[in-house]
Swiss-Prot record:
SUPFAM superfamilies: Thiolase-like (SSF53901). It comes from Rhizobium meliloti. GO terms for cellular component: plasma membrane. The chain crosses the membrane at residues 328-347. Keywords: Cell inner membrane, Cell membrane, Membrane, Nodulation, Plasmid, Transferase, Transmembrane, Transmembrane helix. One of its GO terms (molecular function) is 3-oxoacyl-[acyl-carrier-protein] synthase activity. The keyword 4Fe-4S does not apply. The gene is nodE. This is Nodulation protein E. PROSITE patterns: KS3_1, KS3_2. It is an enzyme of class 2 (transferase). Proposed to synthesize NOD factor fatty acyl chain. Involved in the synthesis of a highly unsaturated fatty acid moiety, which forms part of a lipo-oligosaccharide that is responsible for host specificity. It is found in: Cell inner membrane. It holds the Pfam family ketoacyl-synt. Residues 2-400 form the Ketosynthase family 3 (KS3) domain.
Amino acid sequence: MDRRVVITGMGGLCGLGTDTTSIWKWSARRRSAIGPVLNTELHGLKGIVGAEIKALPDHNIDRKQLVSMDRISVLAVIAAHEAMRQAGLSCNEGNALRFGATVGVGLGGWDATEKAYRPSLSTGGRTEIFTGVKAMPSAAACQVSMSLGLRGPVFGVTSACSSANHAIASAVDQIKCGRADVMLAGGSDAPLVWIVLKAWEAMRALAPDTCRPFSAGRKGVVLGEGAGMAVLESYEHATARGATILAEVAGVGLSADAFHITAPAVHGPESAMRACLADAGLNAEDVDYLNAHGTGTKANDQNETTAIKRVFGDHAYSMSISSTKSTHAHCIGAASALEMIACVMAIQEGVVPPTANYREPDPDCDLDVTPNVPRERKVRVAMSNAFAMGGTNAVLAFKQV
């Protein structure tokens, strides 16, 4: 069944703001949410920068549900409700079986795990009763489903830094295959906890100050927390109810490097971008804006630049590219969901968000990465790259309708 899939609502929160309007506003104005991590439960870990959500918005999550939720699930539910409000949609007995959710989670509930096991290890006592269900990778999808009453296809997706794009791709498949008419899809993660930060510190991957994608002298990744969700519908379902269509999910490209657990390879990202263009029926020249994976590490940014050149040829120098991780940091499982918001808003507003914190050109990353200043241009097609550790790659193309 060849069904077009469109986006009719979006929700999100991260260090930049607690709704899509504020996320887009500050990202487009190159404001960076990166700063010292103020979490009081870092157990002596010093000098860590990240992009924290300083205060959650009012969410009205039922107390009985809240006690079984990790922060990842809370963020996902808040974003899902915002997306539903924007879409003007509700779930009821008439549509619940045709309404599902896929939520990408890159790391899982380490916040709940650490809070439960630290006292247990020191005292030998029992852990908190909901620890297991808070920490499971599918928890966010389950909690979104229960909060909204969704009874169609519901599952979690985990592929590290590409989890949200894989979740959106999976949701597209559910609609195209006829298993659902509407899907909530995106990602959520909350990695600013001691055990995760220590693990990334051990990999020597963390930047000491900020995230500078594609800039000479960049020093690594900065982690952030957040969630992004979108309401996906079949085109027929959306038009039948008179919904406002924000963009079409025009293509999906998935691949694996089969190379190394941490080191990047060019062929995997190249294959995913080519597959995405083919799936969307697009030529390379049709892409106006590419939201890069752009983590701010020397190897990854150089690798992605090479892959982009291979796929787009001369057009690689004509299209606009940026990494919004420079503003909201790397939110792991939520990263490409937040970048989906950037792509759709670029199409809606005709503005390419900048790569913030850019200092000086790197000759190995010589494409137009929209340094520091947003750019007005017509964006008919935007592409979003997500390339994860372990070599799991997921690329999406969004198109103006």
